[in-house]
Structure formats: structure tokens, C-alpha cells
Amino acid sequence: MDILLYFTVHWGAMTDLANKQKPRWGKKFKDKRHWPSTNELYVVRGMYFLDLDWVENWDVELEEMNRGKVGHPYEFPESLIQLQGLWKAKNIPYRMIEGITRQLFNIAGLPAYNNYTTVCRRINRLDVQIRLPEGTVIELTFEDGTGFQAINGGEYLREKYGKKNRMWVQVVMLGDPKTKEPVGFEVNLVPSSEPESAIRQLENMIEQNIEVKGFGSDGAMDDKRLWNACDEYGINAVIKPDKDARSDGESPQRNWNVKYRNKHGYDKWAKKVGYGMRWPATEGIFSAIKRIFGEQLLARSDVGLVQEAGLKVWAYHRLKHGVVG
């Protein structure tokens, strides 16, 4: 038995190594980054986890938040909660967040500190949606979904939503391939239709007077509802059609893409429509989020799981912009 186990483990490892040593297809990647400035950028990002520039406006911010408020007034400004939300996105427990805030109160002149129950309540109410300025023009955005692992709420999810949906919280994101930033996202406890999520997000952007010129995704999103939505809103669709797709369907755009791909081949089609930009707009962003903030969720409740997953995407977007308070 031990020999069989040894053989299985080591043969698998050797097979993986052999696969990794195979020559990669396509052009060899050339890293053109200027490493001194790139390194400094990553160092500066760490400063945002302790950015206290907003503290001087503590009283002004509280006064604005409490103007016209009914009931008990806010005691802690939203900027503090946003900073604590950044820590929470790193999977720091609420009690430890209280401890960090206490130390800032002791050594950095923070006017006051909140206890962990207040931190939890305020973070779960924090608006983590990405809000682009009105009039923003998005030349091209790609959609993809991923999952974050609910390590404490796994049993709860299994009991409430069924065995198939246990332990993973779905995030459907729209990303910009040029800025390599998320421009919108949706969190679902129970995995839902990605095409429907993409349509909702596109419609929300249009309602906010944000112009989306192009939208793309992989073959899993080859859905007539999504093609028709792009036709309706005048959005250039860069969606990979199914290999057996017909070219006489409802969507003029889909028909054109199918005909061009069938005539010229996948590679020329992908180059023509810019499909190769999908990776930096989706998988690249998800990879960065999970490297910085992890893919595990510590929350147990519905609200906590949804908020914690959203916090990770929101926090990454703020880090990219150098914004905390």
C-alpha cells in the first residue's frame, strides 16, 4: 500500500513537472515593466492599509453624516469604516481590527476607537459597489465569474441551499482590459446565470449614464439574451460563439461573428474583434484579488458572506486608485 501511494504521489508530481517543461504555445512573453517604479508602486500600496490623512476631517465628516439623521448619531466617520473594511478584506478578524484601531488611538492620535461589534455592523452596511463617475466611457469590458470559499459558513450554506452549492460564493465581474480594474460586480450566495448578471450590470451602467461601447466574454456566455441586449443598447459584442453555432439567428452581431469565425478561423476572428483582451480584464484581475486578499471567507451569515466577497473586489479597486478614506 505504501509503495502504491508513493508511486501515485511521485508519478503525479513527475507528470506535472513534465507538463510544465513543455514549450508554451504562442509568442514568448516579454516583461516590459520598469521594475524600480513597479516595485515602488507595490510598496506604496501597503501604505494605504494605514493611511490616516482623513483623520483631520473627523469632526467635519461626522457633522455631515449626522445632518438630518433620525435616532442615535454616528460616532465614527465612514472613512474609518472604509479603512477597517480594507483590513477586513485581508481576512483580519473583527476583534483584531478593534485591537489595531485601539493602537492607532494610542499612538497615532485617532480621536476614538470602535469596538468589534460596531465594526462588524458598520462594515456589513458599507456600500462596496463600484461607482464610476457619470459620463464615463468604457471602450471594452469583459465578464467572468469566480468563487470565494466560505470556510466557516460551508455547513450553513449546505443546509440552507443544498449540497451542490456548498462552500462557494459566486462573484460575477466586469473588468476593463486597459486599466486592469473591475468596473462592476455582483455577488450571489447561490450561483446564478452569468448572462443574466451581465445584462443587469450593463443596464445599471447605462442607467447611471455610463457609456459601454464594447462587451465580451467566453463561450459560456454565448446566450441569445446577451447578444440581443448588446444589439438593443448598441454595444459591440465580443463573445465567443459556440463552434456549432448557426449564422441565421436573431442577433445580427452574432450572425456576423459566426460567419467571420467560420470563414477565417478562430485565430483571425479573435485578433479581429480583440478577444485576446479577455484575460487581463477577468482572470488577471481575479488572480490579483485572490493573491492580495485571499479567496477564503470567514463570515457565517448570508449578509456577512455576500459583504465579505464584495469587500475584496471593492478593496482591490480602491488600492488600484490609491483611495482609502
Please place each PLM-identified region on the residue numbering.
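Polybasic low-complexity intrinsically disordered regions
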Residues: 68-92, 99, 112-233, 247, ...
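Basic, short loop/linker segments at the boundary and entry of helix-turn-helix/winged-helix-like folds
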Residues: 39-89
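Helix-centered, glycine/charged polyanion-binding patches within enzymatic domains
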Residues: 15-31, 219-290
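Intrinsically disordered, low-complexity and often Lys/Arg-enriched segments
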Residues: 1-25, 325
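Basic, amphipathic alpha-helical segments enriched in Lys/Arg and hydrophobic/aromatic residues
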Residues: 86-89, 267-325
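Conserved, mostly hydrophobic/aromatic
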Residues: 34
